[in-house]
């Protein structure tokens, strides 16, 4: 039978030329794998599985481990180089890297706070109104007000009637004498009122009676210098009784006068 134009005897010759000498390597690797499995099963478990301070096995441990495990020479050299590189890289770091960084942050690094802006604050609007005044200044103000007040009252006395004054105040007339009420002759009154003779001719009590139409001769304030208890009163009822008594007393006198002028 021809395969690709070649006869079977030629194919046999080509197979003879091929060399499968690597079979002993594969058999050796398989036998080495079985021995590695048995040796790994015979290893005792590690006493402390956790790594303390990043402890890594040394290069001697790697050599013994590589001798126990049958690995190709190229892979073993690569693993040995890698272990030496890791050891060198860890040797460059300090023993406690975390502690050093934390202390450096605490000692060297500082985070200053935001500086406060220095701006001028406006004074309180009601600071002046609530500030207490000294007692001497208040006393002086009251004293000065008491001095100027009577002058204002005297200057306003020439105006129209009905002006208010202090209680028990007395005024002088144009002739220089003391002002008196034309009805009860009172000199002191809180207010001078208009009467039948003009403005400021009656005291406050008589002026109120005159305004209401009840000013009669029997009426007198109790403070009037012409007040007589049997003839005057400051009560309206008492005044009406006095007027009735006067009328009763006048009737017989009028009858007698009438008989005297017209005899029978």
Swiss-Prot record:
Transcriptional activator that specifically binds 5'-GATA-3' or 5'-GAT-3' motifs within gene promoters. May be involved in the regulation of some light-responsive genes. It comes from the Eukaryota. It is found in: Nucleus. Keywords: Activator, DNA-binding, Metal-binding, Nucleus, Transcription, Transcription regulation, Zinc, Zinc-finger. Residues 101-110 have a biased composition (Polar residues). GO terms for molecular function: DNA-binding transcription factor activity; sequence-specific DNA binding; zinc ion binding. Residues 155-164 have a biased composition (Gly residues). A motif (Nuclear localization signal) lies at residues 114-121. Its main location: nucleus. Mostly expressed in roots. Also expressed in flowers and leaves, and to a lower extent in stems. GO terms for cellular component: nucleus. Gene3D superfamilies: Erythroid Transcription Factor GATA-1, subunit A. GO terms for biological process: positive regulation of DNA-templated transcription; response to light stimulus. Belongs to the type IV zinc-finger family. Class A subfamily. PROSITE patterns: GATA_ZN_FINGER_1 (PS00344), GATA_ZN_FINGER_2 (PS50114). This is GATA transcription factor 2. It comes from Arabidopsis thaliana (Mouse-ear cress). A zinc finger (GATA-type) spans 175-229. Residues 29-57, 96-192 are annotated as: Disordered.
């Amino acid at each position: 039978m021809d395969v690709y134009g070649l006869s079977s005897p030629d194919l046999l010759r080509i197979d003879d030329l091929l060399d499968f000498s690597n079979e002993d390597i594969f058999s050796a690797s398989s036998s080495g794998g079985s021995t590695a499995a048995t040796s790994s099963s015979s290893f005792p478990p590690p006493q402390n599985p956790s790594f303390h301070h990043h402890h890594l096995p040394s290069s001697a441990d790697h050599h013994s481990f590589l001798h126990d495990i049958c690995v190709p020479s190229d892979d073993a050299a690569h693993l040995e180089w890698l272990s030496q590189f890791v050891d060198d890289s860890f040797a460059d770091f300090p023993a406690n890297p975390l502690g050093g960084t934390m202390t450096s942050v605490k000692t060297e690094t500082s985070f200053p706070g935001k500086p406060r802006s220095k701006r001028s604050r406006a004074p309180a609007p009601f600071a002046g109104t609530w500030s207490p005044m000294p007692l001497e200044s208040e006393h002086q103000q009251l004293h000065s007000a008491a001095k100027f007040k009577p002058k204002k009252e005297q200057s306003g006395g020439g105006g129209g009637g009905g002006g208010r004054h202090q209680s028990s105040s007395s005024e002088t007339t144009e002739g220089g004498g003391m002002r008196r009420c034309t009805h009860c002759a009172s000199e002191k009154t809180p207010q001078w009122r208009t009467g039948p003779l003009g403005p400021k001719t009656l005291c406050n009590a008589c002026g109120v009676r005159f305004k209401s139409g009840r000013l009669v001769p029997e009426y007198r304030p109790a403070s009037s210098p012409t007040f007589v208890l049997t003839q005057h009163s400051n009560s309206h009822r008492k005044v009406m009784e006095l007027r009735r008594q006067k009328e009763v007393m006048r009737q017989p006198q009028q009858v007698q006068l009438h008989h005297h002028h017209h005899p029978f």
